[in-house]
């Protein structure tokens, strides 16, 4: 079949709208009509050429929602017309990682997904016989996609696609880090570094669980208003305090119980750890640093009880937890509407990247 898609032909170049050939679903695969997709910073990271795993030409996008059009042989968990979110972190429920119950990082299809291919080591996309690679196993910048069944989360049908798509990455990454990774308890003091889309979702996750102080750290004072709306209690601009770590420790009566780094900067990663409370403070790295970067701190910070951890896709198990997060939104527990600042047709997708680079959007959504 034919599908319209925004193709990344090479790093650093704008996406171009193309008619792409899409092979139908094979055994254990699902054909989805994507109705909406967010434009995430990870897409920009890959498009910029900074991503060492970036492969071109490819169809980017990993934050989508849509409808099942067709299923391949053996598919049992979804059927035609189901509303779904494609998952860049699948959940096979059978691999060593899934069975451990210690992680959400299913590895069932990781080796081929990282090469821009389906589990059978082929691509479903092509133009004039030339292979176009998949991206993060999802490629939601295409109106139609084929994904493995283990990478499809069925969601309720009354959830609007233009909001549900954001659960495919940003909402889950932030809210999930609080609820599934850190398991923040009521009354805890939380510090959030970076008030972009991920940071704001961390903040509303902390508010959901009843955190005490929720302190936002950012150099952009324009974020104060929306961060307070999502639950931030205090704002700190690092450029306006002499000793950021000391200031945060003072604000939290000895240090944060939990901190979250949502920027991808190794300097703020260190600050996020060192502002944690002696004896029990936990710092979670969510932001992705540039290739080759390394983190450092004095070992004594860890010896004296602080913990340095990471969170990917919010620690959420895709097929199990993503539908719950959509329910939280539909039940009014989560605010997604105010995070969607721009909606665009596919033909204007490059404008969405420009808005992100200029810091003028929280999340732009492409509607098909």
Segments (PLM) and residue ranges:
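C-terminal hydrophobic helical "lid"/dimerization subdomain
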Residues: 1, 254, 270-274, 319-368
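NAD(P)H dinucleotide-binding glycine-rich loop of Rossmann-like/cofactor-binding domains
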Residues: 22, 94-193, 334
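Glycine-rich beta-strand-centered segment in the early N-terminal region that forms part
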Residues: 23-37, 50-99, 104, 112, ...
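Adenosine-nucleotide cofactor-binding segment
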Residues: 192-195, 207-271
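Glycine-rich Rossmann-fold phosphate-binding loop(s) that bind the pyrophosphate
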Residues: 195-196, 288
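N-terminal Rossmann-fold NAD(P) dinucleotide-binding loop
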Residues: 199-200
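Helix-to-beta-strand junctions that scaffold the AdoMet/dcAdoMet cofactor pocket
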Residues: 276-278
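Rossmann-fold dehydrogenase core element
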Residues: 282-284, 296-338
